[in-house]
Design a protein with these regions (language model features):
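Active-site HxH/HxHxD metal-binding segment of metal-dependent hydrolases
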Residues: 486-519
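Di-metal (Zn2+ and/or Mg2+/Mn2+) metal-binding site signature of metallo-dependent hydrolases
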Residues: 162-185, 474-497, 561, 585-599
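Core dinuclear metal-dependent hydrolase active-site scaffold
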Residues: 146, 235-238, 258, 262-264, ...
Length: 673
């Protein structure tokens, strides 16, 4: 069962490594079956920051700090609770130093087979380092080892809309099934006898090929669903009901949901079934058309439906995606993926070298293309407009369209170009993003947008940038990086891709074209902004180089101090005194005891204090001492680790607007209030 929601504790566990460990250079992470001292079993995702070896199938007695899967909650982005539930993950854990081997790994299990395949590719990569990225792509396409691809490659796939091609999904499994079915059909032509029911053998061969590939890829939940879907389609065709694509589609959907009800939580399920439905819808009554016409029509159907699905789910549309996918899908499906499988089943150096060569130059071409490929931010549309957009997309796919296709185009354009209503003059909307154990604050006026810090690279990619898009931020007027620390500027590259007119930093030497955030004042749309600097008596540590921003709208103020410590706070008090007074204070250093001194809280005298920290973080931020100091001053403490992103409206009577995302499903834990 799932790890209890409120329990975060150090435990002695017996763990068995269930899958290949992934090393991202910072930690080794792997899935494990774990048993506590009472014998209760859990499926955990464990992280080892000491980056030790963990053989697949080995069993260990370990000390670990285990917590439930609680992630960031923003208006858009990755929802870790949904991901964990859909993938059967009960909890997360960080391994301590103590471990004792209980049983060696090895054997002939599925995980061991995948580990052997990975090592064979790695040996070739070690021998030919000039093809290391190509080897990484082959490992990703054959056994689903996504960590083999460098982060810059993942960043290149996103603006091209190609992430689905390097994450083994329904597309890969389907193409392998088609390839196996085609091979069996070709083999039958050369047999002296033909089975009485060749269709059965062809369909069975396709499903068997899909199952083999899914097993090689680790038999993850998405690949399991893909095999189930294909098996259901094959069954429908064998029983004779495949003449109607819709009959097979409904039967496949029913089978998947009956065997795996949690499939409804997976974005991949909706994308897979949605795109297949679009293809069936677009080809209805046109099966006599030539192959290339059907292919073009299928690409058109997938593109139209993707406008709504990708715009809503990811708040972004890769503009070159239709063209790039039209070329990349056949290349990946019929060349690179078969070569990846061939090099895995027959791990000869020549086979793997040819595959790596083609993959390497494919990646180099995509990296170049990604530099010139734009993305279009799609703001979160109201539910009525979303429903109308989906109906418009389906209408465009109809053969005739009932004469309403021009109206459908207008609705889709309205969905894509929708923007939230502008703020009033003299009002600032402040969104303290849920950046985990990091910081990112968006400040919006009527016509301007300023972002203070970006959070970590992962949070920026999976939460901050999608949320900026969803809130209608197409470009930043200013980006402030308080200081050079991974939890404050780690997502700089990802956020910079959104575009910014001005970059300010406490340590500008670490960023291109950055200016030092010296003392300054300016006004946007009737809202005053002020950059503050502590007196010369402040500390010289990196944290004390943090930019300090104060925003005032209609007499209501916000103060952000980055990671400024007590020395820096004392320097601010010495220089500005009671001019620091603000209704909202973002606590320094995530609520660490090294900041938020009693004298500073007394001087600022905020109504609200916000701690931006990660749930159950190892530093125990906000610390008990800081919480006690805040409450002793009569200040309301708000926490992103418990509430998710928080919204304030400076310049209005009700400053605190509540959580950014107010609704949640009954099974979700966060927001906790």
């Amino acid at each position: 069962g799932q790890w209890p929601a409120g329990e975060v504790a150090a435990k002695v566990l017996t763990v068995e490594v269930a899958d290949m460990p992934r090393d991202d250079g910072r930690r080794v992470q792997f899935a494990a079956r774990a048993w506590d001292e009472q014998g209760q079993a859990f499926d955990l995702m464990l992280s080892d920051y000491q980056r030790r070896d963990w053989a697949v199938g080995s069993r260990w007695s370990v000390s670990a700090r285990v917590r439930p899967v609680i992630g960031e909650v923003n208006v858009r982005g990755l929802n870790r609770e949904i991901w964990a539930l859909a993938n059967g993950i009960d909890g997360m854990g960080t391994l301590g130093r103590d471990r004792k081997l209980v049983r060696q790994g090895g054997g002939f299990g599925l995980a061991n087979m995948r580990d052997a395949v990975s090592r064979s590719w790695q040996r070739t990569g070690d021998k030919y380092p000039e093809f290391s990225d190509g080897i990484g792509l082959m490992r990703a396409l054959s056994i689903g080892e996504q960590s083999a691809l460098r982060p810059p490659l993942w960043q290149a796939f996103r603006p091209l809309g190609l992430t689905h091609l390097v994450s083994i999904s329904g597309l890969h499994v389907t193409m392998v099934a088609v390839l196996f079915a085609w091979l069996i059909k070709r083999i039958f032509r050369y047999l002296p006898w033909i089975p009485a029911k060749p269709r059965v053998w062809i369909l069975a061969g396709g499903v068997a090929g899909a199952l083999f590939y899914a097993l090689l890829a680790g038999f993850s939940v998405p690949t399991q669903r893909s095999v189930l879907m294909l098996a259901a389609f094959a069954w429908a065709w064998w029983r004779g009901s495949g003449g109607s694509g819709w009959t097979a589609w409904w039967q496949a959907l029913a089978v998947v949901l009956l065997l795996d009800p949690l499939a409804v939580l997976g974005v991949g399920t909706w994308l897979s079934f949605g795109l297949v439905a679009a293809l069936i819808w677009a080809s209805s009554g046109r099966l006599k058309e030539s192959g290339w016409r059907l292919a073009v029509r299928g690409q058109w159907a997938a593109t139209v439906l993707s406008v709504v699905l990708l715009g809503y789910l990811f708040a972004s549309l890769p503009l070159l995606s239709p063209l790039v996918n039209a070329l990349a899908i056949p290349w990946f499906s019929w060349v690179l993926t078969p070569l990846a499988l061939l090099g895995s089943v027959f791990p000869f150096e020549l086979v793997q070298l040819v595959a790596a060569f083609l993959a390497e130059y494919t990646l180099r071409g995509l990296l170049w293309l990604a530099m010139v490929s734009p993305e279009f931010a799609v703001a979160a549309a109201p539910v009525p407009l979303l429903v109308l957009a989906m109906m418009a997309a389906l209408l465009l796919l109809l053969p005739k369209g009932m004469g309403l296709k021009p109206w459908a185009c207008l609705v889709l354009l309205g969905f894509v170009f929708y923007r939230p209503a502008k703020l009033e003059e003299g009002v600032a909307r402040v969104t303290v993003m849920d950046a985990g154990q990091g910081l990112s604050v968006l400040i919006q006026t009527r016509n301007r947008n300023l972002l203070f810090d970006t959070g970590t690279e992962q949070v920026a990619q999976t939460g901050i940038v999608p949320s900026l898009n969803a809130m209608g931020v197409r470009r930043l007027d200013s980006l402030i990086l308080s200081h050079h620390d991974i939890d404050h500027d780690g997502g700089f590259q990802s956020v910079a891709a959104v575009g910014t007119d001005k970059l300010l930093a406490g340590q500008p030497e670490f960023y291109p074209n950055a200016e030092f955030c010296q003392e300054d004042k300016w006004q946007w749309d009737g809202v005053d902004f002020e950059l503050l600097r502590p007196s010369e008596n402040a500390g010289k540590e990196d944290n004390d180089q943090s930019c300090v921003l104060r925003v005032v709208a209609n007499g209501k103020a916000l103060l952000i101090t980055g990671d400024l410590g007590v020395k820096g706070e004392a320097g601010l008090i010495e220089k500005y005194g009671n001019a620091l007074y603000s209704q909202v204070l973002v606590l320094g250093h995530h609520g660490s005891s090294t900041a938020s001194s009693g004298s500073f809280l007394h001087t600022v005298s905020p109504q609200y204090a916000v701690a931006s920290s990660g749930y159950a973080n190892a530093y125990k931020h906000p610390t008990v001492a800081v919480q006690n100091r805040v409450r002793a001053h009569g200040i309301t403490l708000l926490r992103t680790d418990l509430s998710g992103a928080l919204v304030f409206a400076l310049g209005q009577d009700d400053i605190f607007q509540g959580r950014l995302k107010k609704d949640k499903f009954y099974w979700q834990k966060k927001p906790f209030e």
